[in-house]
């Protein structure tokens, strides 16, 4: 195998099986990321996150809307948000954090979100909410 083919294969595998290669639940409408291209004032981790981790999340959630705004003023906080039913259900402040911290924190939140919306947990939640009619 040529070295170019091997490098390409490694890159594609990294995207498919990356740390954020997590399929999101169907009720999620949008993933929104806002950061500045200027890496001063705590935007460097967010910038690296978009370049290195976001492709994996996008690959595993192809039909989902991804809104990436890299024109945020440098004095504002870079954020990662998940939107469902036109409401932000998860927001993460990425200011002054390193890539590894951002990636692991978001990975934990996505797994928790995925676990909360699994069919077993939804059925269990409906059982808890149901109260039989009183006679």
Curated annotation (Swiss-Prot):
Gene name for this UniProt entry: mrp49
Stretch forming the signal peptide: none
Family according to the record: Belongs to the mitochondrion-specific ribosomal protein mL61 family.
Function: Component of the mitochondrial ribosome (mitoribosome), a dedicated translation machinery responsible for the synthesis of mitochondrial genome-encoded proteins, including at least some of the essential transmembrane subunits of the mitochondrial respiratory chain. The mitoribosomes are attached to the mitochondrial inner membrane and translation products are cotranslationally integrated into the membrane. mL61 is not essential in cells grown at 30 degrees Celsius but is required for mitochondrial translation in cells grown at 18 degrees Celsius.
GO BP term (any one): mitochondrial translation
Phylogenetic lineage: Eukaryota, Fungi, Dikarya, Ascomycota, Taphrinomycotina
Species this chain originates from: Schizosaccharomyces pombe (strain 972 / ATCC 24843) (Fission yeast)
Predominant cellular place of this UniProt entry's protein: mitochondrion
Sorted UniProt keywords: Mitochondrion, Ribonucleoprotein, Ribosomal protein
Cellular compartments per GO CC: mitochondrial large ribosomal subunit
Subcellular location: Mitochondrion
GO molecular function list: structural constituent of ribosome
Basic and acidic residues bias (residue ranges): 114-129
Name of the protein in question: Large ribosomal subunit protein mL61
Keyword presence, Transcription regulation: no
Protein's UniProt keywords contain Signal: no
Positions of the UniProt region annotated as Disordered: 114-135
Subunit structure: Component of the mitochondrial large ribosomal subunit (mt-LSU). Mature yeast 74S mitochondrial ribosomes consist of a small (37S) and a large (54S) subunit. The 37S small subunit contains a 15S ribosomal RNA (15S mt-rRNA) and at least 32 different proteins. The 54S large subunit contains a 21S rRNA (21S mt-rRNA) and at least 45 different proteins.
């Amino acid at each position: 195998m040529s070295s170019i083919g091997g490098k390409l294969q490694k890159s594609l595998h990294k995207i498919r099986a990356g740390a954020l290669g997590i399929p999101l639940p169907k009720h999620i409408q949008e993933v929104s990321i806002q950061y500045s291209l200027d890496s001063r004032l705590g935007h460097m981790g967010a910038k690296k996150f978009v370049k290195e981790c976001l492709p994996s999340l996008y690959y595993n959630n192809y039909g989902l809307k991804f809104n990436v705004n890299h024109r945020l003023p440098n004095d504002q906080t870079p954020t990662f948000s998940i939107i469902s039913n036109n409401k932000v259900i998860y927001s993460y402040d990425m200011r002054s954090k390193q890539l590894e911290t951002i990636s692991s924190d978001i990975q934990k939140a996505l797994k928790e979100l995925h676990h909360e919306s699994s069919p077993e947990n939804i059925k269990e939640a409906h059982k808890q909410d149901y109260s039989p009619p009183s006679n």
